[in-house]
């Protein structure tokens, strides 16, 4: 496509520097930032926001602390020992508050929760943040919509 001018492969923290500030219409994170601890995620996100144009959109999906395999005593970044994320390396888990805090530089347009559960436990829960870069500081807000898909 002639609209894609540049593609980079590698670590966000390094590759974002090769793009001009205020040049992205949108950034879509499909559960890749959650492979970084909170501090590195903040650093990546701060760089990413600089690349968004005013009014640019940011979509991010993250792993919920409600998922089977999350262990609160291990903090929010660890390698799960059970559940669907075993043998995937260390992952960061969030809740609504921590994700909105991470992305506080953006106006929150919507906040969704996508849940997959059986009769015994939540097997998968993804948090989806939809934000927009504005000319002012963080705006907060947002709407929560829950959708449960049950296996019976």
Residue ranges with predicted function:
Residues 42-54:
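A short glycine-rich, Lys/Arg-flanked "PGG" loop and its adjoining helix->strand segment in the class I
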Residues 17-27:
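A short acidic, Gly/Pro-enriched loop at the edge of an enzyme's catalytic core
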Residues 30, 52-53, 97:
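A short, hydrophobic secondary-structure junction motif
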Residues 25-40:
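A short SAM/SAH-binding and catalytic strip from SAM-dependent methyltransferases
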Residues 1-17, 40-43, 57-147, 152:
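Class I (Rossmann-like) S-adenosyl-L-methionine-dependent methyltransferase catalytic domain
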């Amino acid at each position: 496509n002639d609209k894609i001018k540049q593609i980079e492969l590698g670590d966000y923290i390094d590759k974002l520097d090769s793009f001009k500030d205020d040049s992205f219409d949108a950034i879509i994170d499909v559960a890749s930032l959650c492979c970084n601890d909170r501090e590195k995620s903040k650093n990546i996100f701060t760089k990413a926001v600089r690349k968004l144009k005013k009014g640019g959109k940011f979509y991010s999906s993250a792993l919920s602390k409600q998922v089977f395999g999350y262990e609160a005593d291990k903090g929010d970044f660890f390698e799960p020992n059970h559940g669907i994320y075993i043998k995937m390396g260390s992952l960061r888990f969030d809740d609504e508050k921590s994700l909105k805090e991470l992305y506080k530089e953006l106006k929150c347009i919507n906040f969704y929760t996508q849940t997959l559960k059986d009769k015994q436990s939540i097997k998968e829960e993804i948090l989806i943040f939809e934000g927009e870069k504005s000319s002012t500081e963080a705006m907060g807000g947002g709407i929560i919509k829950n959708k449960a898909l049950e296996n019976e």
